[in-house]
From Swiss-Prot:
Belongs to the mimivirus BTB/WD family. Pfam families: BTB. The lineage of its organism: Viruses, Varidnaviria, Bamfordvirae, Nucleocytoviricota, Megaviricetes. Residues 263-290 have a biased composition (Basic and acidic residues). It comes from the Viruses. Residues 16-89 form the BTB domain. Disulfide bonds: none annotated. Residues 250-290 are annotated as: Disordered. InterPro entries: BTB/POZ_dom, SKP1/BTB/POZ_sf, WD40_repeat_dom_sf. Coiled coil: none annotated. This is Putative BTB/POZ domain-containing protein L85.
Amino acid sequence: MLINKFKKDLKLKEYTDLTIVLKDDTCEIEMNVHKTVICIMCKYFENFIKFNSQTEKKSNDKLTVIVPNALITRDIIRNFYDKTSTNSEYPLWRYTLEKIMCRDFLMLDYDSEIIKDLEKIPSEGITLFLEVLSITNYEFSLMTLLKKNISKGYNFKNIPSKIIDELYSYTKPNIIVCMGNENNLELWNIETNKLINNIKLDKPFHHTTNIVCSQNESIIAISDGQTFGLINVLKNTCIYKTYQSKIKYSSSNDSDEDASETESEHNSETESEHNSETESEHNSETESKHNLETKIDLKYNVGNFIKFSRSHNKIIFERDNEIFLWKIIFFPNYECSSYDYNKKKYGCDYYNSYDKKKYKCVVNIDGFPNDKLLYAKKINNFNPKHIYTIYGIKGNEQKTIIFDVPIKIAKYLPMVKIS
């Protein structure tokens, strides 16, 4: 075959008509190649050679190209002649990641089969892996591998918010959380209908609906109107704090505008400003683990809710027409992104209406991160049972379950078996 003759000539150099100098941050490699071969095999080199022939007056028989990795780019060029040519100077995981980056630089697709070589990536390779993710438009198989390889103690602040959002979108959210009949917190797998964790609480919360799940994969907050508890799912431990505190501060501005703004944003940013002022003025009085930082008076009842703040180091709750912000130093902070669906940020494509269904008794609507919607309704006013229906984002019904108690979706909690 013709390509075999070109391959032999790489060593003989009788008909090579171009010298390419491949340069990166650490090395420089010269290769004698055939213009015909590299232009046919690679659009990047075709454009590069054409551009240089039009702009350079001197001979166009030697070109210098700055590449991400000179050694691996050399291997890719050799692959134009011989598909079996490889390089063993790097560990397999690094060679694979660097090769994807180099092929992207050269405007070449990468073979999805090489992803199979990435079963294990050491901690020092995560940064490089994140770079590869960004240039591959968050390839599903790569996102799955990132989930497998990223360690529990990894600092998520080093990961761009876009990748975190993508990670959540690939999470398999099959857990719901509810209060049991014996003052226990239950975690259920909605696909298998099996109880996967049962955490006994030593404070009475009964059938409260005030349950929220943190995005740091292990914390659940629960409230009964007087006390809130923080439950570490991984350790099956609970801590509690009552709302009553000697430290209470009222906002100096009691206008309706401030109140409505606080309600709509759930205090994710507005209370943070009050928080910083309160901390600086009353630092000596703060409690060792928890600090009730600010209280904002409202002109009307916004409803009974408890939420995590945007930075997930604060609990926000409403009681007696007042909104409180409670700082939680005990648990690690976690930066997360906010979503503005009105502006269609982060590719919010679906705004489907479910008009064909009757939702007269709906008591709760929540969403899974993988394009599923759960809504809840009571059977009737005389029956305490709740019907929960899971829908695809486009409105197709997937599953209906009935619970005696209200439930919440644990979007990001890990699968934890009962010990």
